[in-house]
Every structure is written in C-alpha cells, then in structure tokens.
C-alpha cells in the first residue's frame, strides 16, 4: 500500500548526481573572483535544468520524497565542506525547480 510512497531510489540517484555535479563544477571553497566562475555557473544551471526536466518526466514526487531530496542534497554538500547558508538555499532551490518542472510536464 505504501511501497511507492517511501521508494526513494530515483530521488537518491538524482540527489547524488546534483551533489557530484556541484562538487565537480564549483568545489567547496572556490574563489568567487575567478574569471571563469560565471561561465561555470551558467553551464551548471543549464545541466541542472536539463536533468531536472528529464527527472520529472519519469518521477512524480510526494512530500516525503521532496523532503528526502532536500535532505540528501543538504547532507552531501555539507559533507564536502560547503557553507551551511549556501547549502540550505541551494537545496531548497533544487526542490523548487523539481516542483516547477513537475507542473509544466
């Protein structure tokens, strides 16, 4: 009855991909003064948008899965040393992106 409600396999894979993508593009402690930061952020934003769109085509998240997504991203980024205010804001932004993309599919 609740089998799919608590199934977070796809959510965990997506969250892990997001954390790895951010870590690869903008390592913790990056210098915002670098000349390529804006280009890297633009490419990261584009990749996140594309992956989020494809993720929401195959997954409709319930409240538990949305919370799991935010928590998994938050835990992963904090483990890599990103500042807590950035992590909180970023994880909520990803959940908002997923919610918006889910509505437009």
Model-derived regions: residue spans:
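Short cationic/low-complexity microdomains
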Residues: 2-9, 59-80
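Amphipathic alpha-helical interaction modules
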Residues: 24-68
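Amphipathic alpha-helical binding modules
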Residues: 73-105
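Short amphipathic alpha-helical segments
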Residues: 14, 65-69, 86, 90
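Short terminal alpha-helical segments
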Residues: 1-32
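Charge-rich, solvent-exposed alpha-helical interaction surfaces
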Residues: 14-17, 21, 40, 47, ...
């Amino acid at each position: 009855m609740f089998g799919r409600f608590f199934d977070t396999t796809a959510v965990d894979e997506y969250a892990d991909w997001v954390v790895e993508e951010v870590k690869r593009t903008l390592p913790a402690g990056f210098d915002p003064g670098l000349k390529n930061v804006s280009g890297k952020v633009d490419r990261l934003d584009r990749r996140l948008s594309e992956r989020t769109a494809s993720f929401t085509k195959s997954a409709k998240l319930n409240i538990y899965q949305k919370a799991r997504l935010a928590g998994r991203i938050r835990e992963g980024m904090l483990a890599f040393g990103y500042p807590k205010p950035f992590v909180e804001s970023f994880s909520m932004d990803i959940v908002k992106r997923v919610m918006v993309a889910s509505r437009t599919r």
